[in-house]
Amino acid sequence: MASDNIKSVEVINNPGARYDASVKAVIRITTKKAKGEGFGFNNRLVGFKHRFGESLYDQFNFNYREGGFDLTGMLSGGHYDNSQGAITTVDVHSANHWRVKNDMSKQKNINHILSGTLSMNYQFNPDHVMGVRYKLSRDPKIRIDGTALAEAFMDGTMYEQSDARYDIGGQFTSHDINAYYNGKVNDWSIDLNLDGMWHKTKQNQFTAQTITETSRKTMEENMTTFNRTRNNLLASKLVISRPLWDGSLSFGGEYSHNSRTNLYHNDEGVLDSDDSEIKEGMTSGFVEYGRSFGKLGVQAGVRYEHVGFDYYDRGKHIDEQSKTYDDVFPSLALSLPIGKVQTQLVYGTDISRPSYSDLRSNITYVNRYLYETGDPYLLPTRSRNLTFASSYQWLNLVLGYQHIMNDISQLCDPFPGKDPSVSLYKYANIDDYDKAFASLTLAPKVGIWQPQLTLSVQKQWYTAETPDGKAEFNRPLGSFQWQNTLQFSKTFNIGVNASFQTKGHSGNTHLDKTSGALSFSAYKSFFKGRFIAQLFAYDLLQTNRQYLTMYNGGRTVKWEIKPNRSVRLTLRYVFNQAKSKYKGTGAGQSQKARM
Protein backbone atom coordinates (compact mmCIF):
# COMPACT_ATOMS: atom_id res chain seq x y z
CA MET A 1 0.00 0.00 0.00
CA ALA A 2 1.44 3.35 -1.03
CA SER A 3 1.59 6.12 1.58
CA ASP A 4 -0.09 8.65 -0.72
CA ASN A 5 -3.27 6.51 -0.74
CA ILE A 6 -3.54 6.63 3.06
CA LYS A 7 -5.77 9.19 4.75
CA SER A 8 -5.20 8.22 8.39
CA VAL A 9 -3.77 5.47 10.60
CA GLU A 10 -5.25 4.53 13.98
CA VAL A 11 -3.91 2.04 16.51
CA ILE A 12 -6.68 0.32 18.50
CA ASN A 13 -5.36 -1.16 21.75
CA ASN A 14 -8.70 -2.78 22.56
CA PRO A 15 -9.77 -4.66 19.41
CA GLY A 16 -12.69 -6.23 21.26
CA ALA A 17 -14.35 -9.62 21.12
CA ARG A 18 -14.89 -9.68 17.34
CA TYR A 19 -11.17 -10.34 16.77
CA ASP A 20 -9.31 -13.55 17.46
CA ALA A 21 -8.18 -13.80 21.09
CA SER A 22 -4.52 -13.73 19.99
CA VAL A 23 -4.93 -10.18 18.63
CA LYS A 24 -3.53 -7.62 21.07
CA ALA A 25 -3.97 -4.54 18.87
CA VAL A 26 -5.35 -3.54 15.47
CA ILE A 27 -4.00 -0.97 13.04
CA ARG A 28 -6.94 0.62 11.22
CA ILE A 29 -5.90 2.30 7.96
CA THR A 30 -8.38 4.67 6.31
CA THR A 31 -7.63 5.22 2.63
CA LYS A 32 -8.51 8.18 0.48
CA LYS A 33 -11.60 8.20 -1.70
CA ALA A 34 -11.24 6.07 -4.81
CA LYS A 35 -10.49 7.93 -8.03
CA GLY A 36 -12.35 7.71 -11.32
CA GLU A 37 -12.73 4.94 -13.85
CA GLY A 38 -10.31 3.53 -16.39
CA PHE A 39 -6.93 1.83 -16.32
CA GLY A 40 -4.09 2.76 -13.99
CA PHE A 41 -0.84 1.30 -12.74
CA ASN A 42 2.20 1.97 -10.64
CA ASN A 43 5.60 0.32 -10.53
CA ARG A 44 7.89 0.23 -7.51
CA LEU A 45 11.59 -0.69 -7.80
CA VAL A 46 13.49 -1.20 -4.54
CA GLY A 47 17.25 -1.61 -4.21
CA PHE A 48 18.67 -2.62 -0.84
CA LYS A 49 22.30 -2.74 0.26
CA HIS A 50 23.49 -3.84 3.68
CA ARG A 51 26.69 -4.99 5.30
CA PHE A 52 26.33 -8.62 4.26
CA GLY A 53 24.71 -8.41 0.81
CA GLU A 54 22.36 -6.77 -1.69
CA SER A 55 18.68 -7.15 -2.61
CA LEU A 56 16.59 -6.01 -5.57
CA TYR A 57 12.79 -6.09 -5.71
CA ASP A 58 10.20 -4.93 -8.25
CA GLN A 59 6.43 -4.66 -7.77
CA PHE A 60 3.92 -3.81 -10.50
CA ASN A 61 0.35 -2.90 -9.48
CA PHE A 62 -2.50 -2.30 -11.90
CA ASN A 63 -6.20 -1.49 -11.64
CA TYR A 64 -9.18 -1.25 -13.97
CA ARG A 65 -12.52 0.22 -12.92
CA GLU A 66 -15.78 0.55 -14.82
CA GLY A 67 -19.07 1.20 -13.07
CA GLY A 68 -19.32 -1.11 -10.07
CA PHE A 69 -16.64 -3.48 -11.39
CA ASP A 70 -13.13 -3.20 -9.96
CA LEU A 71 -10.15 -5.31 -11.07
CA THR A 72 -6.76 -5.01 -9.37
CA GLY A 73 -3.61 -7.04 -9.56
CA MET A 74 0.00 -7.22 -8.47
CA LEU A 75 3.09 -8.91 -9.91
CA SER A 76 6.36 -8.90 -8.01
CA GLY A 77 9.71 -10.58 -8.01
CA GLY A 78 13.06 -10.12 -6.45
CA HIS A 79 16.38 -11.33 -5.18
CA TYR A 80 16.77 -11.07 -1.41
CA ASP A 81 19.98 -11.40 0.57
CA ASN A 82 19.00 -11.57 4.25
CA SER A 83 22.43 -12.57 5.53
CA GLN A 84 23.35 -11.63 9.07
CA GLY A 85 26.09 -12.75 11.42
CA ALA A 86 25.85 -14.02 15.00
CA ILE A 87 28.18 -15.53 17.58
CA THR A 88 26.93 -17.70 20.47
CA THR A 89 28.77 -18.93 23.54
CA VAL A 90 27.30 -21.78 25.59
CA ASP A 91 28.52 -22.24 29.19
CA VAL A 92 27.76 -25.55 30.89
CA HIS A 93 28.21 -25.66 34.66
CA SER A 94 28.46 -29.34 35.63
CA ALA A 95 31.23 -31.43 37.20
CA ASN A 96 33.45 -29.57 34.73
CA HIS A 97 33.01 -26.12 33.26
CA TRP A 98 32.41 -26.44 29.53
CA ARG A 99 32.42 -23.50 27.16
CA VAL A 100 31.48 -23.87 23.48
CA LYS A 101 31.86 -20.86 21.19
CA ASN A 102 29.98 -20.99 17.86
CA ASP A 103 30.89 -18.42 15.23
CA MET A 104 28.24 -18.33 12.48
CA SER A 105 29.03 -14.81 11.30
CA LYS A 106 29.95 -16.00 7.79
CA GLN A 107 26.55 -16.97 6.46
CA LYS A 108 24.71 -16.15 3.23
CA ASN A 109 20.92 -16.31 3.07
CA ILE A 110 19.59 -15.92 -0.49
CA ASN A 111 15.92 -15.96 -1.56
CA HIS A 112 14.48 -15.64 -5.06
CA ILE A 113 10.80 -14.73 -4.80
CA LEU A 114 7.88 -14.45 -7.22
CA SER A 115 4.37 -13.36 -6.30
CA GLY A 116 1.13 -12.50 -8.04
CA THR A 117 -2.29 -11.33 -6.83
CA LEU A 118 -5.56 -10.84 -8.72
CA SER A 119 -8.65 -9.29 -7.09
CA MET A 120 -12.13 -8.80 -8.57
CA ASN A 121 -14.73 -6.69 -6.86
CA TYR A 122 -18.31 -5.77 -7.81
CA GLN A 123 -20.49 -3.21 -6.05
CA PHE A 124 -24.13 -3.84 -6.94
CA ASN A 125 -25.29 -0.71 -5.09
CA PRO A 126 -24.17 1.27 -2.02
CA ASP A 127 -25.47 -1.53 0.27
CA HIS A 128 -24.11 -4.66 -1.41
CA VAL A 129 -20.59 -5.53 -2.55
CA MET A 130 -18.73 -8.80 -3.04
CA GLY A 131 -15.39 -9.95 -4.40
CA VAL A 132 -12.75 -12.65 -4.69
CA ARG A 133 -8.95 -12.55 -4.48
CA TYR A 134 -6.28 -15.11 -5.39
CA LYS A 135 -2.59 -14.93 -4.48
CA LEU A 136 0.27 -17.14 -5.65
CA SER A 137 3.65 -16.97 -3.93
CA ARG A 138 6.64 -18.94 -5.12
CA ASP A 139 10.22 -18.98 -3.84
CA PRO A 140 12.00 -21.10 -6.47
CA LYS A 141 15.32 -20.73 -4.72
CA ILE A 142 16.03 -20.58 -1.00
CA ARG A 143 19.73 -20.94 -0.30
CA ILE A 144 21.60 -20.72 3.00
CA ASP A 145 25.28 -21.53 3.07
CA GLY A 146 28.27 -20.64 5.17
CA THR A 147 30.81 -21.84 7.67
CA ALA A 148 30.45 -22.45 11.38
CA LEU A 149 33.57 -22.54 13.52
CA ALA A 150 33.07 -24.09 16.96
CA GLU A 151 35.61 -24.29 19.78
CA ALA A 152 35.06 -26.38 22.93
CA PHE A 153 36.92 -25.68 26.18
CA MET A 154 36.91 -27.78 29.35
CA ASP A 155 37.91 -25.94 32.53
CA GLY A 156 39.55 -23.24 30.43
CA THR A 157 41.62 -25.61 28.27
CA MET A 158 40.98 -26.21 24.58
CA TYR A 159 39.29 -29.60 24.17
CA GLU A 160 38.52 -29.73 20.45
CA GLN A 161 37.30 -27.60 17.57
CA SER A 162 34.99 -28.11 14.64
CA ASP A 163 35.06 -26.42 11.25
CA ALA A 164 31.76 -27.02 9.45
CA ARG A 165 30.59 -26.08 5.97
CA TYR A 166 26.82 -26.22 5.49
CA ASP A 167 24.58 -25.84 2.47
CA ILE A 168 20.79 -25.59 2.76
CA GLY A 169 18.55 -25.43 -0.30
CA GLY A 170 14.78 -25.32 -0.60
CA GLN A 171 11.62 -24.08 -2.29
CA PHE A 172 8.35 -22.60 -1.07
CA THR A 173 4.95 -22.44 -2.80
CA SER A 174 1.66 -21.05 -1.49
CA HIS A 175 -1.85 -20.54 -2.85
CA ASP A 176 -4.24 -18.23 -0.97
CA ILE A 177 -7.82 -17.39 -1.87
CA ASN A 178 -10.40 -15.11 -0.22
CA ALA A 179 -14.03 -14.43 -1.10
CA TYR A 180 -16.23 -11.95 0.74
CA TYR A 181 -19.66 -10.36 0.87
CA ASN A 182 -20.35 -7.04 2.56
CA GLY A 183 -23.94 -5.87 2.72
CA LYS A 184 -26.68 -4.09 4.58
CA VAL A 185 -30.34 -5.12 4.90
CA ASN A 186 -32.42 -2.50 6.73
CA ASP A 187 -30.48 -1.96 9.97
CA TRP A 188 -28.50 -5.19 9.70
CA SER A 189 -24.89 -5.10 8.47
CA ILE A 190 -23.34 -8.37 7.25
CA ASP A 191 -19.64 -9.11 6.75
CA LEU A 192 -18.80 -12.62 5.48
CA ASN A 193 -15.31 -13.93 4.59
CA LEU A 194 -14.31 -17.35 3.21
CA ASP A 195 -10.63 -18.34 2.98
CA GLY A 196 -8.49 -21.19 1.71
CA MET A 197 -4.73 -21.64 1.94
CA TRP A 198 -2.31 -24.30 0.68
CA HIS A 199 1.42 -24.07 1.47
CA LYS A 200 4.33 -26.41 0.72
CA THR A 201 7.99 -26.13 1.76
CA LYS A 202 10.92 -28.41 0.89
CA GLN A 203 14.42 -28.19 2.35
CA ASN A 204 17.65 -30.18 1.90
CA GLN A 205 20.66 -29.69 4.15
CA PHE A 206 24.20 -31.03 3.86
CA THR A 207 26.88 -30.33 6.46
CA ALA A 208 30.50 -31.45 6.20
CA GLN A 209 32.73 -30.77 9.18
CA THR A 210 36.26 -31.48 10.30
CA ILE A 211 36.79 -32.10 14.01
CA THR A 212 40.25 -31.52 15.46
CA GLU A 213 41.16 -32.76 18.94
CA THR A 214 43.92 -31.32 21.10
CA SER A 215 46.19 -34.16 19.99
CA ARG A 216 45.74 -32.74 16.45
CA LYS A 217 43.94 -35.91 15.49
CA THR A 218 41.19 -35.12 13.00
CA MET A 219 38.05 -36.84 11.85
CA GLU A 220 35.38 -36.09 9.27
CA GLU A 221 31.66 -36.04 10.00
CA ASN A 222 28.85 -35.48 7.47
CA MET A 223 25.14 -34.89 8.01
CA THR A 224 22.42 -34.97 5.33
CA THR A 225 18.77 -34.16 6.05
CA PHE A 226 15.53 -33.67 4.11
CA ASN A 227 12.47 -31.82 5.41
CA ARG A 228 9.08 -31.26 3.78
CA THR A 229 6.06 -29.54 5.32
CA ARG A 230 2.56 -29.04 3.94
CA ASN A 231 -0.10 -26.71 5.38
CA ASN A 232 -3.77 -26.66 4.35
CA LEU A 233 -6.45 -24.39 5.80
CA LEU A 234 -10.14 -23.65 5.23
CA ALA A 235 -11.75 -20.85 7.24
CA SER A 236 -14.90 -18.75 7.43
CA LYS A 237 -15.88 -15.68 9.43
CA LEU A 238 -19.27 -13.97 9.82
CA VAL A 239 -19.88 -10.66 11.63
CA ILE A 240 -23.40 -9.21 11.97
CA SER A 241 -24.11 -5.83 13.54
CA ARG A 242 -27.00 -3.42 13.99
CA PRO A 243 -27.98 -0.38 16.09
CA LEU A 244 -29.65 -1.29 19.40
CA TRP A 245 -30.81 0.85 22.34
CA ASP A 246 -28.81 3.93 21.29
CA GLY A 247 -25.75 1.76 20.83
CA SER A 248 -24.30 -0.86 18.50
CA LEU A 249 -24.60 -4.63 18.82
CA SER A 250 -22.24 -7.01 17.01
CA PHE A 251 -22.12 -10.78 17.07
CA GLY A 252 -20.77 -13.56 14.91
CA GLY A 253 -18.46 -16.51 14.69
CA GLU A 254 -15.42 -17.99 13.01
CA TYR A 255 -14.48 -21.52 12.00
CA SER A 256 -11.21 -22.90 10.69
CA HIS A 257 -9.80 -26.34 9.99
CA ASN A 258 -6.19 -26.90 9.12
CA SER A 259 -3.74 -29.74 8.77
CA ARG A 260 0.04 -29.75 8.76
CA THR A 261 2.25 -32.67 7.73
CA ASN A 262 5.94 -32.80 8.55
CA LEU A 263 8.35 -35.29 6.96
CA TYR A 264 11.96 -35.30 8.18
CA HIS A 265 14.72 -37.76 7.28
CA ASN A 266 18.42 -38.09 8.11
CA ASP A 267 20.44 -40.22 5.64
CA GLU A 268 23.15 -41.13 8.15
CA GLY A 269 20.61 -42.37 10.73
CA VAL A 270 22.08 -40.22 13.50
CA LEU A 271 18.80 -38.35 14.06
CA ASP A 272 15.36 -39.90 14.33
CA SER A 273 13.10 -39.50 11.32
CA ASP A 274 9.74 -37.78 11.69
CA ASP A 275 6.49 -38.43 9.83
CA SER A 276 3.88 -36.49 11.81
CA GLU A 277 0.62 -34.71 11.15
CA ILE A 278 -1.30 -32.08 13.08
CA LYS A 279 -5.04 -31.59 12.55
CA GLU A 280 -6.66 -28.68 14.30
CA GLY A 281 -10.17 -27.26 14.21
CA MET A 282 -11.19 -24.00 15.87
CA THR A 283 -14.73 -22.75 16.42
CA SER A 284 -15.42 -19.38 18.01
CA GLY A 285 -18.34 -17.09 18.72
CA PHE A 286 -18.58 -13.59 20.09
CA VAL A 287 -21.01 -10.88 21.11
CA GLU A 288 -20.10 -7.24 21.65
CA TYR A 289 -22.11 -4.16 22.60
CA GLY A 290 -21.10 -0.53 22.79
CA ARG A 291 -22.94 2.69 23.61
CA SER A 292 -22.49 6.02 25.33
CA PHE A 293 -23.97 7.08 28.66
CA GLY A 294 -23.55 10.82 28.54
CA LYS A 295 -19.82 11.40 28.12
CA LEU A 296 -18.96 7.87 29.21
CA GLY A 297 -18.40 5.41 26.38
CA VAL A 298 -18.71 1.69 27.17
CA GLN A 299 -17.77 -1.29 25.03
CA ALA A 300 -18.21 -4.78 26.49
CA GLY A 301 -17.83 -8.14 24.85
CA VAL A 302 -17.12 -11.81 25.35
CA ARG A 303 -15.55 -14.36 23.01
CA TYR A 304 -15.61 -18.16 23.25
CA GLU A 305 -13.06 -20.35 21.45
CA HIS A 306 -13.04 -24.14 21.16
CA VAL A 307 -9.91 -25.80 19.73
CA GLY A 308 -9.47 -29.49 19.02
CA PHE A 309 -5.81 -30.44 18.46
CA ASP A 310 -4.95 -33.93 17.18
CA TYR A 311 -1.39 -35.20 16.77
CA TYR A 312 -0.50 -38.19 14.58
CA ASP A 313 2.81 -40.06 14.38
CA ARG A 314 3.11 -42.15 11.19
CA GLY A 315 -0.66 -42.18 10.89
CA LYS A 316 -1.29 -43.23 14.51
CA HIS A 317 -3.24 -40.90 16.80
CA ILE A 318 -1.14 -39.95 19.86
CA ASP A 319 -3.59 -39.40 22.71
CA GLU A 320 -1.18 -37.80 25.21
CA GLN A 321 -0.13 -35.14 22.68
CA SER A 322 -3.68 -34.42 21.49
CA LYS A 323 -5.60 -31.76 23.39
CA THR A 324 -8.88 -29.89 23.57
CA TYR A 325 -9.13 -26.26 24.70
CA ASP A 326 -12.23 -24.31 25.71
CA ASP A 327 -11.60 -20.67 26.59
CA VAL A 328 -13.69 -17.59 27.36
CA PHE A 329 -12.23 -14.12 26.79
CA PRO A 330 -14.13 -11.16 28.28
CA SER A 331 -13.26 -7.56 27.38
CA LEU A 332 -14.37 -4.18 28.70
CA ALA A 333 -13.40 -0.67 27.58
CA LEU A 334 -14.43 2.60 29.24
CA SER A 335 -13.68 5.96 27.63
CA LEU A 336 -14.31 9.37 29.18
CA PRO A 337 -13.19 12.90 28.25
CA ILE A 338 -12.08 14.97 31.26
CA GLY A 339 -11.97 18.52 30.03
CA LYS A 340 -9.69 18.41 26.98
CA VAL A 341 -8.07 15.15 28.07
CA GLN A 342 -9.26 11.90 26.50
CA THR A 343 -8.99 8.85 28.78
CA GLN A 344 -9.61 5.15 28.30
CA LEU A 345 -9.46 2.15 30.66
CA VAL A 346 -9.36 -1.31 29.08
CA TYR A 347 -9.47 -4.82 30.53
CA GLY A 348 -9.01 -7.84 28.32
CA THR A 349 -7.63 -11.35 28.10
CA ASP A 350 -5.78 -12.86 25.18
CA ILE A 351 -4.02 -16.02 24.09
CA SER A 352 -0.99 -16.81 21.93
CA ARG A 353 -0.92 -20.33 20.59
CA PRO A 354 2.46 -21.88 19.67
CA SER A 355 3.43 -21.92 16.01
CA TYR A 356 3.31 -25.28 14.27
CA SER A 357 7.07 -25.14 13.86
CA ASP A 358 7.43 -24.84 17.64
CA LEU A 359 5.26 -27.97 18.01
CA ARG A 360 7.47 -30.18 15.84
CA SER A 361 9.17 -33.20 17.42
CA ASN A 362 12.06 -33.80 15.00
CA ILE A 363 15.56 -32.67 15.97
CA THR A 364 17.41 -30.37 13.57
CA TYR A 365 21.20 -30.57 13.25
CA VAL A 366 23.17 -27.31 13.50
CA ASN A 367 26.69 -28.61 14.16
CA ARG A 368 28.49 -31.09 16.39
CA TYR A 369 27.60 -29.13 19.53
CA LEU A 370 24.17 -27.69 18.70
CA TYR A 371 20.81 -29.25 17.89
CA GLU A 372 17.34 -27.69 17.78
CA THR A 373 13.81 -29.03 18.27
CA GLY A 374 10.24 -28.08 19.17
CA ASP A 375 7.83 -29.59 21.68
CA PRO A 376 4.39 -31.02 20.78
CA TYR A 377 3.39 -30.70 24.47
CA LEU A 378 3.60 -26.88 24.44
CA LEU A 379 0.66 -25.04 26.02
CA PRO A 380 -0.75 -21.73 24.74
CA THR A 381 0.37 -18.52 26.42
CA ARG A 382 -2.42 -16.62 28.17
CA SER A 383 -2.42 -13.14 29.66
CA ARG A 384 -4.76 -10.85 31.56
CA ASN A 385 -4.26 -7.20 30.68
CA LEU A 386 -5.27 -3.89 32.23
CA THR A 387 -4.42 -0.77 30.23
CA PHE A 388 -4.97 2.95 30.83
CA ALA A 389 -4.51 5.42 27.97
CA SER A 390 -4.71 9.20 28.01
CA SER A 391 -4.18 11.84 25.33
CA TYR A 392 -4.06 15.64 25.31
CA GLN A 393 -3.30 17.50 22.09
CA TRP A 394 0.15 16.10 21.09
CA LEU A 395 0.74 14.12 24.30
CA ASN A 396 -0.14 10.42 24.64
CA LEU A 397 0.34 8.27 27.75
CA VAL A 398 -0.18 4.51 28.04
CA LEU A 399 0.12 2.51 31.30
CA GLY A 400 -0.42 -1.23 31.53
CA TYR A 401 -0.15 -4.31 33.70
CA GLN A 402 -0.12 -7.96 32.57
CA HIS A 403 -0.27 -11.35 34.25
CA ILE A 404 1.33 -13.82 31.82
CA MET A 405 0.78 -17.58 32.07
CA ASN A 406 2.69 -20.35 30.26
CA ASP A 407 4.85 -17.97 28.25
CA ILE A 408 6.91 -19.73 25.56
CA SER A 409 10.66 -19.27 25.52
CA GLN A 410 13.63 -20.95 23.89
CA LEU A 411 15.77 -22.87 26.39
CA CYS A 412 19.14 -24.59 26.16
CA ASP A 413 19.06 -28.15 27.52
CA PRO A 414 21.67 -30.93 27.52
CA PHE A 415 21.42 -33.13 24.44
CA PRO A 416 20.45 -36.72 25.34
CA GLY A 417 23.70 -38.63 25.78
CA LYS A 418 26.88 -38.54 27.83
CA ASP A 419 28.64 -35.54 26.27
CA PRO A 420 27.85 -32.44 28.40
CA SER A 421 29.30 -30.07 25.78
CA VAL A 422 26.44 -30.83 23.35
CA SER A 423 23.31 -28.66 23.70
CA LEU A 424 19.72 -28.90 22.51
CA TYR A 425 17.78 -25.69 21.84
CA LYS A 426 14.08 -26.25 22.43
CA TYR A 427 10.90 -24.29 23.10
CA ALA A 428 9.23 -24.66 26.48
CA ASN A 429 6.65 -23.04 28.72
CA ILE A 430 8.18 -21.00 31.51
CA ASP A 431 6.75 -20.03 34.91
CA ASP A 432 3.99 -17.42 35.23
CA TYR A 433 5.02 -13.83 35.86
CA ASP A 434 3.72 -10.26 35.97
CA LYS A 435 4.82 -7.32 33.84
CA ALA A 436 4.13 -3.58 33.91
CA PHE A 437 4.78 -1.15 31.09
CA ALA A 438 4.47 2.55 30.34
CA SER A 439 5.02 4.73 27.30
CA LEU A 440 4.86 8.47 26.71
CA THR A 441 4.68 9.96 23.21
CA LEU A 442 5.19 13.64 22.40
CA ALA A 443 4.38 14.70 18.84
CA PRO A 444 4.21 18.52 18.50
CA LYS A 445 4.49 20.39 15.22
CA VAL A 446 6.83 23.38 15.05
CA GLY A 447 6.71 24.98 11.62
CA ILE A 448 8.21 22.55 9.12
CA TRP A 449 9.62 20.40 11.96
CA GLN A 450 7.47 17.43 13.00
CA PRO A 451 9.21 15.60 15.87
CA GLN A 452 7.87 12.53 17.65
CA LEU A 453 9.53 11.24 20.81
CA THR A 454 8.41 7.97 22.41
CA LEU A 455 9.77 6.92 25.82
CA SER A 456 8.97 3.37 26.95
CA VAL A 457 9.79 1.24 29.96
CA GLN A 458 8.75 -2.24 31.05
CA LYS A 459 9.45 -4.17 34.24
CA GLN A 460 8.76 -7.81 34.96
CA TRP A 461 8.62 -9.91 38.11
CA TYR A 462 10.15 -13.20 37.03
CA THR A 463 12.29 -15.79 38.83
CA ALA A 464 14.85 -17.51 36.61
CA GLU A 465 17.01 -20.59 37.11
CA THR A 466 20.71 -19.67 36.85
CA PRO A 467 23.97 -21.55 37.53
CA ASP A 468 23.96 -19.90 40.98
CA GLY A 469 20.38 -20.92 41.77
CA LYS A 470 17.18 -18.91 41.54
CA ALA A 471 17.52 -15.22 40.70
CA GLU A 472 15.04 -12.37 40.37
CA PHE A 473 14.98 -11.07 36.79
CA ASN A 474 13.33 -7.75 37.62
CA ARG A 475 15.63 -5.19 36.00
CA PRO A 476 13.56 -2.66 34.00
CA LEU A 477 14.04 -2.43 30.25
CA GLY A 478 13.82 1.02 28.71
CA SER A 479 13.86 2.42 25.19
CA PHE A 480 13.26 5.61 23.26
CA GLN A 481 12.52 6.43 19.65
CA TRP A 482 13.01 9.95 18.34
CA GLN A 483 11.65 10.63 14.87
CA ASN A 484 12.20 13.99 13.19
CA THR A 485 10.63 15.02 9.89
CA LEU A 486 11.36 18.30 8.10
CA GLN A 487 8.44 18.91 5.70
CA PHE A 488 9.89 21.49 3.30
CA SER A 489 6.94 21.14 0.90
CA LYS A 490 4.23 18.70 -0.12
CA THR A 491 6.73 17.08 -2.47
CA PHE A 492 9.91 17.01 -0.37
CA ASN A 493 10.82 16.01 3.16
CA ILE A 494 13.74 14.52 5.04
CA GLY A 495 13.85 12.60 8.31
CA VAL A 496 16.42 11.85 10.98
CA ASN A 497 15.50 9.11 13.45
CA ALA A 498 17.26 7.75 16.52
CA SER A 499 16.51 4.75 18.74
CA PHE A 500 18.06 3.48 21.96
CA GLN A 501 17.63 0.33 24.07
CA THR A 502 18.86 -0.05 27.67
CA LYS A 503 20.05 -3.10 29.55
CA GLY A 504 17.40 -5.13 31.33
CA HIS A 505 15.46 -8.37 31.67
CA SER A 506 12.90 -9.92 29.32
CA GLY A 507 11.62 -13.35 30.30
CA ASN A 508 14.61 -15.61 31.01
CA THR A 509 16.94 -13.34 29.02
CA HIS A 510 19.12 -10.40 30.04
CA LEU A 511 20.14 -7.69 27.57
CA ASP A 512 23.76 -7.22 28.57
CA LYS A 513 24.62 -3.96 26.77
CA THR A 514 22.86 -0.88 25.52
CA SER A 515 22.28 -0.49 21.80
CA GLY A 516 20.99 2.15 19.45
CA ALA A 517 20.71 3.24 15.85
CA LEU A 518 20.72 6.48 13.87
CA SER A 519 18.79 6.56 10.59
CA PHE A 520 18.14 9.00 7.75
CA SER A 521 15.37 9.24 5.15
CA ALA A 522 14.45 11.50 2.23
CA TYR A 523 11.28 11.72 0.10
CA LYS A 524 10.81 13.60 -3.16
CA SER A 525 7.99 13.49 -5.71
CA PHE A 526 8.16 14.82 -9.28
CA PHE A 527 5.74 15.57 -12.13
CA LYS A 528 2.69 16.13 -9.91
CA GLY A 529 3.30 12.96 -7.93
CA ARG A 530 3.77 10.62 -10.88
CA PHE A 531 7.39 9.84 -10.03
CA ILE A 532 8.53 9.32 -6.44
CA ALA A 533 11.99 8.66 -5.00
CA GLN A 534 12.60 7.57 -1.42
CA LEU A 535 15.94 6.99 0.30
CA PHE A 536 16.34 5.31 3.69
CA ALA A 537 19.61 4.63 5.52
CA TYR A 538 19.53 2.57 8.74
CA ASP A 539 22.13 2.35 11.53
CA LEU A 540 24.51 4.87 10.00
CA LEU A 541 27.03 4.58 12.85
CA GLN A 542 26.78 0.76 13.12
CA THR A 543 25.89 0.94 16.82
CA ASN A 544 22.97 -1.51 16.82
CA ARG A 545 25.09 -4.40 18.07
CA GLN A 546 23.13 -6.63 20.45
CA TYR A 547 24.47 -8.65 23.37
CA LEU A 548 22.16 -10.85 25.42
CA THR A 549 22.31 -13.88 27.72
CA MET A 550 19.68 -16.61 27.99
CA TYR A 551 19.53 -18.56 31.29
CA ASN A 552 18.34 -22.11 31.86
CA GLY A 553 19.61 -23.66 35.07
CA GLY A 554 23.19 -24.86 34.65
CA ARG A 555 23.42 -23.61 31.06
CA THR A 556 23.70 -20.09 29.75
CA VAL A 557 23.85 -18.90 26.15
CA LYS A 558 25.43 -15.57 25.21
CA TRP A 559 24.43 -14.06 21.87
CA GLU A 560 26.34 -11.42 19.95
CA ILE A 561 24.44 -10.08 16.94
CA LYS A 562 26.52 -7.82 14.75
CA PRO A 563 25.25 -4.45 13.48
CA ASN A 564 23.84 -4.34 9.97
CA ARG A 565 24.05 -0.90 8.37
CA SER A 566 21.78 -0.70 5.33
CA VAL A 567 20.65 1.66 2.57
CA ARG A 568 17.38 1.33 0.65
CA LEU A 569 16.37 3.27 -2.47
CA THR A 570 12.79 3.11 -3.78
CA LEU A 571 11.73 4.47 -7.18
CA ARG A 572 8.01 4.56 -8.00
CA TYR A 573 6.08 5.61 -11.09
CA VAL A 574 2.30 6.18 -10.94
CA PHE A 575 -0.24 6.48 -13.77
CA ASN A 576 -3.90 7.07 -12.89
CA GLN A 577 -3.46 4.79 -9.89
CA ALA A 578 -6.51 4.27 -7.68
CA LYS A 579 -6.79 2.27 -4.51
CA SER A 580 -8.64 -1.01 -4.61
CA LYS A 581 -12.25 -1.11 -3.40
CA TYR A 582 -11.71 -4.66 -2.18
CA LYS A 583 -13.14 -5.05 1.34
CA GLY A 584 -12.28 -8.65 2.16
CA THR A 585 -10.53 -8.88 5.53
CA GLY A 586 -9.92 -12.65 5.60
CA ALA A 587 -10.72 -15.46 8.01
CA GLY A 588 -8.48 -17.72 10.10
CA GLN A 589 -5.79 -15.07 10.33
CA SER A 590 -4.32 -16.32 13.63
CA GLN A 591 -4.04 -19.86 12.24
CA LYS A 592 -2.29 -18.57 9.12
CA ALA A 593 0.25 -16.73 11.26
CA ARG A 594 1.06 -19.93 13.16
CA MET A 595 1.88 -21.70 9.89
Each language-model region and where it sits:
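N-terminal periplasmic accessory domains that precede
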Residues: 1, 11, 21-45, 56-58
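Surface-exposed extracellular loop regions of Gram-negative outer-membrane beta-barrel proteins
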Residues: 31-44, 85, 89, 102, ...
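Transmembrane beta-barrel wall of Gram-negative outer-membrane proteins
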Residues: 53-85, 97-145, 173-175, 183, ...
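C-terminal beta-signal and adjacent terminal beta-strands/loops
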Residues: 526-595
